[in-house]
Design a protein with these regions (language model features):
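N-terminal targeting or regulatory segments adjacent to alpha/beta-hydrolase or S9 domains
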Residues: 1-92
Length: 92
């Protein structure tokens, strides 16, 4: 499956997917996040991953299991990291 035509977007998305076997990302979540991103648009990349992580954190507050919340926090942390990948140190 190819998410993006832009090589760097595709590579970074695949890097997020590398964490799936260890619970650090979820295919369905990544696919939904990628649908919100305009290919080649760095601002869209940032907001897509950031919003996906924030939605996951909000949803995790309803989980009764601490373990499930912990798994969600792990995935959200990876999505936040992905959101910031293309940011310039000069961005505010």
């Amino acid at each position: 499956m190819v998410f993006f035509k832009t090589r760097e977007f595709e590579f970074e998305t695949r890097r997020v997917m590398w964490y799936c076997p260890n619970g650090g990302s979820d295919f369905a979540e990544v696919e939904n996040i990628c649908r919100q991103i305009t290919d080649g648009n760095y601002e869209s990349w940032y907001h897509g991953w950031k919003n996906g992580a924030e939605k996951l954190l909000k949803r995790s507050q309803r989980y009764s299991s601490k373990i499930s919340r912990g798994h969600a926090f792990l995935r959200a942390s990876r999505y936040f990291q992905a959101s910031e990948f293309f940011l310039s140190p000069l961005d505010k």
